[in-house]
């Protein structure tokens, strides 16, 4: 009964993800109908925002526009696959706290202990699940525009670095980082 109750309303599509033959996780973030007024009336087109990830540290997003919804989704998925970026993960969570933004959208992501789950809203949740983060605390502030939230989240995740990468940049060993 409790499982049925959870599947009603806005939560029913929350965990909807598609695994395609190549092992990528595809998430549909938003579909929007846009109208253009012309002499003969209104012309409707659709936009789709999607996120694609491998669940192991790669993620990309795409934005497609077309006269029909399935075509817009297909275009955005293709674009997302072309724009994959790598993210350094630490056993299913982040290495450190991340603050970033795009436009007026601001995102804050913090590593969480095992068993916490993905505590994030809408567009951020889709990106974090697609990249393979299992435990994270996240908050979006400012604009909640899905496109800008996805851009800010991907930008923040790709800028995050593991201690090994920081040590390699500085020409040191990981053990030397905290000791000057």
UniProtKB/Swiss-Prot annotation:
Task: Point out the signal peptide segment.
Answer: none
S5 DRBM domain ranges (all copies): 24-87
Query: Which Pfam families does the annotation name?
Result: Ribosomal_S5, Ribosomal_S5_C
Q: Which SUPFAM superfamilies match?
A: dsRNA-binding domain-like, Ribosomal protein S5 domain 2-like
Cite the Gene3D superfamilies for this sequence. 3.30.160.20, 3.30.230.10
Q: Which UniProt keywords apply?
A: Ribonucleoprotein, Ribosomal protein, RNA-binding, rRNA-binding
Specify the domain of life of the species encoding this protein. Answer: Bacteria
One Gene Ontology BP term is: translation
Q: What is this protein for, i.e. what is its function?
A: With S4 and S12 plays an important role in translational accuracy.
What name does this protein carry? Small ribosomal subunit protein uS5
Question: In which organism is this protein found?
Answer: Stenotrophomonas maltophilia (strain R551-3)
